[in-house]
UniProtKB/Swiss-Prot annotation:
Gene3D superfamilies: 3.30.190.20, 3.40.50.790. The lineage of its organism: Bacteria, Pseudomonadati, Pseudomonadota, Betaproteobacteria, Nitrosomonadales. Binds directly to 23S rRNA. The L1 stalk is quite mobile in the ribosome, and is involved in E site tRNA release. Protein L1 is also a translational repressor protein, it controls the translation of the L11 operon by binding to its mRNA. This is Large ribosomal subunit protein uL1. GO terms for cellular component: cytosolic large ribosomal subunit. InterPro entries: Ribosom_uL1_bac-type, Ribosomal_uL1, Ribosomal_uL1-like, Ribosomal_uL1/biogenesis, Ribosomal_uL1_3-a/b-sand, Ribosomal_uL1_CS. Keywords: Repressor, Ribonucleoprotein, Ribosomal protein, RNA-binding, rRNA-binding, Translation regulation, tRNA-binding. Belongs to the universal ribosomal protein uL1 family. It comes from the Bacteria. Pfam families: Ribosomal_L1 (PF00687). One of its GO terms (biological process) is regulation of translation. Coiled coil: none annotated.
Amino acid sequence: MAKTSKRYREIVQKIDRSQLYSLVDALALVKETAVAKFDESVDIAINLGIDVRKSDQVVRGSVVLPSGTGKSVRVAVFAQGDKAKEALDAGADIVGFEDLAERVKAGEINFDLAIASPDAMRVVGQLGQILGPRGLMPNPKVGTVTVDVINAIRNAKAGQVQFRADKAGIVHCTVGRASFDVEALRANIMALVDALNKSKPTTSKGVYLRKMAISSTMGVGVRVDHTAIV
């Protein structure tokens, strides 16, 4: 515990918590202070100027990060017939229909993302209480309910991430790994910011992107001067 506390103090001393850093400087600091023995994820938190109590101000979507996520993604596809064959050919790890639904009901959930063809939703709809709490329920708003299963699979494998504002109006997202260089992380963040701007509710008033902070898994949050990048 003493070693952990000492390490934490050393990290904190390198970061001025009252300062707003440029995106590049913030990323450099996050990389410098990510000293765990594993490749820490780099995470971002963005406060949005939305009223989460209003149904027309829900911010949700997906974006393919140009530098990827640094994580291998296992994709399950609910489809049958030609769509099932397309999914297999596109590199899906698991493909099935009612048989896959039964495996999920039995607790066999060995995938990171679920995609469904529209006709499969009559089967997938029964799995809401199982997949929903795990963030795995296919949804057309993030492109995981689609007739184009090939493109959905390719996007998932290429580093697509989903985002959604929480009850406090904050979007949390992993944008890479500490082993990524600064430019790769910057490109991923810019892609996310662009996607968030495109998802801005028309009824949102005032400043939309309000605050931004970046951290590694075991690190300390670094505040970013987001006004220079939005």
